[in-house]
């Protein structure tokens, strides 16, 4: 009861068994580990670790420091695989703690040792093989696996505090928890999620702890100490690393005392930590109803136990999810009956990482949710299941307790242990990233599509991260200047563009099609303006009448309306960079049409090249057949897509679609030129890409 210790307080937790569980889970992840980067944020975070840089706000400084140190270990793995291994170890650590927690709960219930270990093993396996947990643990796509490890350590400390006699020494575990909460916030703001559960559990056992000034001071001090990695951000930002998103510093020309401790640095750091640039609505300003938001969580919960990506087994997926949900809820009830002390922590924690987190994140409809509603509802740009991996991993604890309780009542309840094996078998092909090199190959393919010293304007950051990875981690084409069009609305990307070093082109490492020519290294940045001049560019300017845009190389037409800051910079880029630097746009960019430049555009592989003279009519750009065919032959992406097989993430389908569209266009052009044999080769390779990515319906092909 409150104010007392639990029976069995002197028992040492089964750390050896927890370690074995950690090793077993880690082996599963190592067998299915990604050999390199992946789509979405993985490339950004791996690159940030490599160059000791700053990823997108809030900057995740503790992750960067941990990953950078881990990446220096002399392991027989590529740099990316080492960072992926860090994700695997982190998730596996949480699995070991869940084993200890389950064993402890069942010991309180008087469950026999063998049965305890079987149920704990099943619960750990179930949580570890949940689709999102598994898929995120074999590549460092986010920082959430390190957060999961910290949640596990906090849980272990909390369990020990609840089980031990009251003493100042025992209370030091609360101080350690406060330190981990602060440090967890430096990994990701979600690091605070266990906080409410800790407070409730402490209040349950002995609310008088909140009246002890010394303990409160130690806890507060430890929490603040845990936040100190944020000091890394302005210090490192001032040194201008290759990856410096948000640039949270007032220092423009190197680290100095005066600019570091300035109002400008404070404001930029605060904006970075608070993610001000994303302008996320208040939690009180609901983007959609709470019901559909819970529906999104339920969709992702169903995915965990059988990731039926093509909808072939919807009924089986639903039944399995209902069983896992029901057994878990029953396990929560059994937990409450058997062990109120740990339940006082674990139940609030589970509520926080499920219901409360759903409400707080305030997402729009999920990318895959309610497809029948189409574009009639606001949607996230991708499925956000990764935000809930903590609840999916931890759900295995209550499922294990539920199985133990049912097994005690019914001998047949032992059969529920089979639940633990179903996700392992059903999710293997979907969760494994063992042969996935698509993101690395795609980034390198785009970079190798452009001429030396080119400038390439990309549409979004997620499309650009693989290019950053290729440049910063693998040294592919650092001579290319990569510009994200949306970032040009902010000052720091423009400043970095103006001050970026110009790397020499390495013809030996570059594509064969660019060899045998002399490429002159540019002498100035792609944008030829001062920092002050760039800061004076307005957020937008109104165009009342059609305007002719002329540079030394091209002539376009700007229609009436509003030019945003990014548009102004792109026009200035065309003026300043050409003809010294070739300019490219990624496929799908709206700028050629927006500025009336279609007749200057020539498709070369995966990119559009802005030529200095017209190469087509005003209806659209032309295709450089010879160069595109040469690029197609050197591209690694199509083979990687076929090798990967099932394309689970439909939100990133643009990647295989870009290859497929190029292949279709190229094969048709080769046919028109009478090169039917070469056309058939490209067409067959394109069809293989379409089928591997499951795009038959999109491209009008019958399913096999």
At which residue positions do the language-model features occur?
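Extracytoplasmic catalytic/substrate-binding loops of multi-pass membrane glycan-assembly enzymes
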Residues: 33-45, 55-67, 261-262, 434-438
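N-terminal membrane topogenic signal
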Residues: 5-20, 115
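Loop-to-helix entry region of an early transmembrane alpha helix in multi-pass inner-membrane enzymes
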Residues: 61, 73-96, 100, 117, ...
């Amino acid at each position: 009861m409150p104010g007392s210790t639990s029976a069995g307080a002197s028992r040492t937790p089964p750390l050896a068994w927890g370690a074995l569980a950690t090793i077993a889970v880690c082996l599963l992840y190592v067998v299915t580990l990604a050999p390199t980067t992946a789509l979405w944020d993985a490339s950004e975070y791996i690159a940030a670790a490599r160059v000791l840089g700053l990823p997108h706000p809030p900057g995740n400084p503790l992750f960067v420091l941990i990953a950078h140190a881990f990446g220096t270990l002399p392991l027989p793995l590529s740099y990316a695989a080492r960072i992926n291994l860090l994700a695997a170890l982190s998730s596996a650590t949480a699995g070991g703690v869940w084993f200890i927690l389950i064993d402890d709960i069942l010991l309180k219930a008087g469950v026999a040792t063998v049965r305890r270990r079987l149920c704990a093993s099943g619960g750990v396996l179930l949580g570890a093989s949940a689709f999102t947990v598994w898929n995120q643990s074999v590549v460092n796509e986010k920082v959430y696996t390190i957060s999961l490890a910290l949640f596990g350590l906090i849980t272990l400390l909390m369990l020990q505090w609840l089980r031990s006699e009251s003493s100042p020494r025992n209370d030091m575990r609360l101080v350690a928890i406060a330190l981990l909460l602060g440090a967890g916030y430096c990994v990701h703001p979600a690091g605070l999620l266990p906080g409410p559960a800790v407070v409730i559990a402490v209040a349950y056992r002995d609310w008088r702890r909140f009246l002890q000034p010394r303990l409160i001071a130690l806890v507060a001090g430890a929490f603040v100490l845990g936040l100190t990695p944020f000091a890394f951000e302005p210090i490192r930002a001032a040194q201008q690393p290759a990856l410096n998103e948000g640039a949270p510093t007032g220092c423009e020309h190197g680290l100095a005392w005066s600019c570091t401790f300035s109002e400008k640095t404070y404001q930029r750091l605060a904006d970075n930590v608070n993610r001000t640039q994303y302008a996320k609505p208040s939690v009180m300003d609901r983007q959609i109803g709470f019901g559909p938001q819970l529906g999104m969580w339920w969709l992702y919960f169903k995915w965990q136990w059988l990731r039926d990506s093509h909808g072939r087994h919807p009924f089986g997926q639903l039944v399995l999810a209902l069983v896992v949900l029901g057994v878990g809820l029953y396990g929560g009830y059994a937990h409450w009956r058997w062990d109120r002390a740990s339940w006082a922590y674990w139940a609030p924690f589970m509520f926080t990482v499920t219901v409360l987190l759903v409400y707080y994140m305030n997402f729009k409809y999920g990318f895959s949710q309610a497809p029948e509603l189409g574009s009639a509802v606001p949607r996230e740009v991708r499925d956000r299941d990764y935000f809930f991996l903590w609840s999916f991993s931890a759900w295995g604890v209550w499922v294990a307790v539920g199985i133990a309780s049912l097994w005690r009542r019914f001998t047949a309840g032992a059969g529920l242990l089979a639940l633990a094996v179903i996700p392992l078998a059903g999710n293997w092909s979907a969760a494994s990233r063992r042969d996935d090199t698509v993101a690395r190959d795609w980034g390198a393919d785009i970079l190798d599509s452009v001429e030396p010293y080119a400038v390439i304007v990309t549409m979004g950051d997620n499309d650009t991260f693989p290019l950053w990875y290729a440049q910063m981690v693998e040294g592919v084409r650092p001579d290319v200047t990569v510009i994200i069009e949306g970032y040009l609305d902010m000052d720091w990307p423009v400043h970095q563009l103006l001050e970026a070093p110009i790397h020499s082109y390495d013809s030996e490492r570059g594509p064969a099609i660019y060899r045998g020519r002399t490429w002159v290294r540019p002498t100035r940045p792609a944008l030829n303006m001062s920092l002050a001049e760039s800061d004076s560019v307005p957020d937008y300017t109104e165009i009342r009448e059609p305007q002719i845009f002329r540079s030394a190389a091209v002539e376009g037409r700007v229609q009436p309306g509003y030019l945003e800051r990014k548009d102004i910079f792109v026009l200035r880029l065309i003026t300043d960079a050409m003809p010294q630097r070739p300019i490219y746009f990624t496929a799908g960019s709206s700028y050629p049409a927006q500025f009336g430049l279609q007749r200057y555009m020539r498709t070369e592989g995966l990119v559009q090249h802005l030529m200095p003279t017209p190469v087509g009519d005003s209806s659209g750009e032309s295709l450089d057949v010879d160069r595109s065919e040469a690029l197609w032959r050197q591209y690694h992406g199509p083979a990687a897509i076929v090798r990967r097989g099932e394309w689970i993430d439909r939100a990133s389908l643009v990647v295989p679609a870009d290859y497929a569209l190029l292949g279709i266009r190229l094969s048709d052009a080769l046919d028109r030129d009478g090169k039917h044999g070469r056309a058939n080769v490209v067409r067959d390779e394109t069809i293989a890409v379409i089928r591997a990515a499951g795009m038959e319906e999109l491209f009008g092909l019958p399913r096999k």
